[in-house]
Each structure stands twice: as structure tokens, then as C-alpha cells.
């Protein structure tokens, strides 16, 4: 364990641990670029049930509920939507998010109702690649 994290065992009730985590200084996150922060923040908030912790027109952070991780959305007016599947000479995805689900078909339908797209190209069974409203690929799997 890194020295700066030693002794940071979380004790107390769930509520005490949740409040205490906001005092920590070892946060890390994944940040997605988007032309419209609000649209993408609301999509992931509704998809995963993560509250929007901070939001303004330049960015947002979603509270994942445990630990010290967050999902960030930052406005990028020059954002170029990636293509899926990847194509030479075209904007490539930089990364993607994976979410394990219990009922794959139900979660695909729910994601699409929230604004996701289901592309024709699907590389494997038990996993579905979808595109969020900004075009970022993400996977749902069982």
C-alpha cells in the first residue's frame, strides 16, 4: 500500500464513511470530453444512478458512491465523435467504460431509452458495445 494511504482504513457507519471520503485528498477519476456537459452528465447519472456531485458549463463530476473515484465530464468545443468500429484515419476512441449488469437485454433497452445507440458491429457474445450521447463507446456485459 502506498505510504500516503496507510492508516486510512475507513471505520464507522456507512454515513460517517461517506462524509469522511469527501475530506480525502487521493481522489482519481476518468474524464470524458463532450460538446455538452449537461447531456452527458445526466446520461451517466441516470444510467448508473450516480448523483451529479459538481456541475457547471465547463464540467461535471459524478459521485460513484464509494471509495475515491469519480466520473468527470469536461466541455470540449472541438470534440470529435469517435467512430465505431475503429477506422484508419478517423477519430479513434481513447478509452471505454465497462459495466457489469444482471439482465443484459433490459439494460440495453434502458440505455437506449436514455439516449445510447446500439451499433451494428458487436465483437463478442455476452457483451454489447453501445455509444453514449457524445459517441463514446461503452460496454454492458454479464
PLM regions: where:
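Short, acidic, Ser/Thr-enriched surface-loop or helix-capping motifs
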Residues: 132
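Conserved short beta-strand elements that form part of the metal-binding/catalytic scaffold
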Residues: 4, 51-91, 137-142
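A generic local structural motif
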Residues: 17-18, 82-85, 115
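Conserved Rossmann-like nucleotide-cofactor binding loop
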Residues: 102, 136
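Long, low-complexity, intrinsically disordered polar/charged segments
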Residues: 43-46, 80-101
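Core segments of cupin and vicinal oxygen chelate
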Residues: 20-75, 107-109, 113-121, 125-129
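N-terminal beta-strand motif that seeds the catalytic metal site of vicinal oxygen chelate
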Residues: 2-42, 94-101, 141
